[in-house]
């Protein structure tokens, strides 16, 4: 009987070791945050440099005329109303 109990204990031990060494299934909800962080920093750096290049290029393709200043846009009638002649 002692040999049968030894065989059962040995068999249970072998089964435990075999189950422990079984390859783990890939968990789809495990993320690699280090790669995600590095990728985000690279994209942020590229967008930052692109923004600086756009600002420094001084090319704005806007629809309004950029050559008009605030002084030229004033009406001459408004300037006449506030002249010193009315005092």
Swiss-Prot record:
Gene3D superfamilies: Single helix bin
Residue numbers bearing the Phosphoserine modification: 75, 83
Disulfide linkage: none
Post-translational modification: Major plasma membrane substrate for cAMP-dependent protein kinase (PKA) and protein kinase C (PKC) in several different tissues. Phosphorylated in response to insulin and adrenergic stimulation. Phosphorylation at Ser-83 stimulates sodium/potassium-transporting ATPase activity while the unphosphorylated form inhibits sodium/potassium-transporting ATPase activity. Phosphorylation increases tetramerization, decreases binding to ATP1A1 and reduces inhibition of ATP1A1 activity. Phosphorylation at Ser-75 leads to greatly reduced interaction with ATP1A1, ATP1A2 and ATP1A3.
Any one GO cellular component localisation term in the record: caveola
Topology in the lipid bilayer: Single-pass type I membrane protein
Role description: Associates with and regulates the activity of the sodium/potassium-transporting ATPase (NKA) which transports Na(+) out of the cell and K(+) into the cell. Inhibits NKA activity in its unphosphorylated state and stimulates activity when phosphorylated. Reduces glutathionylation of the NKA beta-1 subunit ATP1B1, thus reversing glutathionylation-mediated inhibition of ATP1B1. Contributes to female sexual development by maintaining the excitability of neurons which secrete gonadotropin-releasing hormone.
Subunit structure: Homotetramer. Monomer. Regulatory subunit of the sodium/potassium-transporting ATPase (NKA) which is composed of a catalytic alpha subunit, a non-catalytic beta subunit and an additional regulatory subunit. The monomeric form associates with NKA while the oligomeric form does not. Interacts with the catalytic alpha-1 subunit ATP1A1. Also interacts with the catalytic alpha-2 and alpha-3 subunits ATP1A2 and ATP1A3. Very little interaction with ATP1A1, ATP1A2 or ATP1A3 when phosphorylated at Ser-83. Interacts with the non-catalytic beta-1 subunit ATP1B1.
Protein's name according to its UniProt entry: Phospholemman
Organism, scientific name: Sus scrofa
């Amino acid at each position: 009987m002692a040999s049968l109990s030894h065989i059962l204990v040995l068999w249970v031990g072998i089964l435990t070791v075999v189950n422990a060494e079984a390859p783990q299934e890939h968990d789809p909800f495990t993320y690699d945050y280090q790669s995600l962080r590095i990728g985000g920093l690279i994209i942020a750096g590229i967008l930052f440099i692109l923004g600086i290049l756009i600002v420094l290029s001084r090319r704005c393709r806007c629809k309004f005329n950029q050559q008009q200043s605030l002084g030229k846009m004033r009406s001459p009638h408004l300037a006449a109303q506030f002249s010193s002649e009315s005092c």
